[in-house]
Regions:
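Active-site phosphate-binding strand-loop segment of PLP-dependent enzymes
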Residues: 158, 162-230
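Conserved PLP-anchoring active-site segment centered on the Schiff-base-forming lysine
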Residues: 128-150
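N-terminal small-domain helix-loop-helix segment of the aminotransferase-like
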Residues: 2-116, 124, 300-302, 408-410
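Helix C-cap/helix->beta junction micro-motif
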Residues: 26-29, 153, 213-214, 328, ...
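PLP-dependent enzyme catalytic core of the Aspartate aminotransferase-like
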Residues: 96, 100, 350-353, 360-370, ...
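Conserved glycine-rich beta-strand-loop-beta hairpin in the small C-terminal domain of fold type I
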Residues: 297, 312-322, 332-345, 379
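Conserved core segment of the aminotransferase class I/II
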Residues: 53, 239-240, 244-315, 319-328, ...
Length: 410
């Protein structure tokens, strides 16, 4: 029997699975591991969103009381199949969210599609638009689905270095000139995971102009639009005039509303790309459970105080972690956005590389982080902390790290 699966063979070990095995082994030894390894929000979803889910799920089965929002596309009860692109009411809520936030006008029918989390949308967009021989430009380091969605689609990735010591646009322009065949797509993510890098609207104006000049599709992952600090505001690429001619943008409710397990996201912008994603999804899924879509409408259109509270929680955790690490002798910068801290490995450990250093942190400090190598070769000088532990546990982690650093320096 043929057991050669070329598509799978192109994939390296997934960073989160590697770290999960390390945590499993440590806990089997009885270690109390303080876990900063995965950006998986630890707090519950706001109550009004959960209440709407329950209401839609329960009342959607009651023939004596069925509201219009409890119906799927065909006007039948919510426990039946939905539609892959999302019910119209949800797509309108998504379009309205963009209008309120960015003053961007979107057609809910042709320029908005609901996705089962942003990760699914990004991967299936690659499947819908790419094939063998196509080349996609992806920053390095990057969130794994950005390059490996391309790989799974059978296309090729051209990595573009994204580190403080280089000019990203110089690197990008060189990559465009040196790549043959010409790149078909550019994938961006700001505020960035894992690097936490932030940009202004001028950055997107330049990116859109460059992509228009070279006829390159632009895909932007805006997962951390709401998780911003110290007065920073994350721009949307769709704010750039003419961006919809060549660009789409994805967003997820996972971080802004503490809904990671719900798997709710959307992609907006260029109708050709949105249409391609809608077509391939029509063959692959029937969309989210309709009560989840009803609850997502409540999230987008209901009280937004919860978003500010979630952001403030991450800011406070950021301050505790960064202040504590700096006091312990591990110099890190406070990020202006995201739920991560991207920390350069301390000098005495730098030659280990990020994977071995992560193992040392686990063994000696009982702290789990993500090794930067899992996000690309240019990430190997760093590790990523996800701000998913409370402040008490974070201070406990800092004490363990401080002891580890002190042993090394003596």
């Amino acid at each position: 029997m043929n057991t050669v699966f070329p598509r799978i063979q192109r994939l390296p070990p997934y960073v989160f699975n590697v770290v999960a095995e390390m945590k499993k082994a440590a806990r089997a030894r009885g270690d109390d591991v303080i876990d900063f390894s995965m950006g998986n929000p630890d707090q519950p979803t706001p109550k009004h969103i959960v209440d709407k889910l329950v209401e839609a799920a329960v009342r959607g089965t009651d023939s004596d009381y069925v509201k219009p929002e409890h119906l799927n596309e065909e006007g039948t009860h919510t426990h039946r199949y939905s539609v892959s692109k999302g019910v119209p009411r949800l797509r309108r809520a998504m379009a309205n969210w963009y209008k309120r936030r960015y003053d961007v006008d979107l057609d809910p029918d042709s320029e908005v599609i609901a996705t089962i989390g942003s990760k699914e949308g990004l991967a299936h967009l690659a499947f819908a638009t790419l094939s063998a021989g196509d080349v996609v430009l992806v920053p390095n380091p990057a969130y794994p689905i950005h390059p490996y969605g391309v790989v799974l689609a059978g296309a090729d990735v051209r990595h573009v270095r994204l580190t403080p010591e280089v000019d990203f646009f110089e690197e990008l322009e060189r990559a465009i000139k040196e790549t043959w065949p010409a790149p078909k797509m550019l994938i961006l993510n700001f505020p960035g995971n894992p690097t936490t890098q932030c940009v202004d609207l001028g950055f997107f104006e330049k990116a859109v102009a460059l992509c228009r000049e070279h006829q390159i599709w632009l895909v932007h992952d805006l997962a951390y639009a709401d998780i911003v600090f110290d007065g920073y505001t994350a721009p949307s690429v769709l704010q750039v005039p003419g961006a919809k001619d060549i660009a789409v943008e994805s967003f997820t409710l996972s971080k802004s509303y503490n809904m990671p397990g719900w798997r709710v996201g959307f992609m907006c912008g260029n109708p050709t790309l949105v249409g391609a994603l809608a077509r391939i999804k029509s063959y692959l899924d029937y969309g989210m459970f309709t009560p989840v879509q009803v609850a997502a409408i409540s999230a987008l259109e209901g009280p937004q105080d919860c978003v500010g509270e979630i952001c403030e929680m991450y800011r406070s955790r950021r301050d505790v972690l960064c202040d504590g690490l700096n006091a312990a002798g591990w110099k890190v910068e406070k990020p202006k956005a995201t739920m991560f801290v991207w920390a350069e490995i301390p000098e005495p450990f730098r030659e280990l590389g990020s994977l071995e250093f992560s193992k040392r942190l686990m063994d000696e400090a009982k702290v789990a982080v993500s090794p930067g190598i899992g996000f690309g070769e240019y990430g190997d000088t760093h590790v990523r902390f996800a701000l998913i532990e409370n402040e008490h546990r974070t201070r406990q982690a800092i004490r363990g790290i401080k002891r580890m650093l002190k042993r090394t320096n003596t």
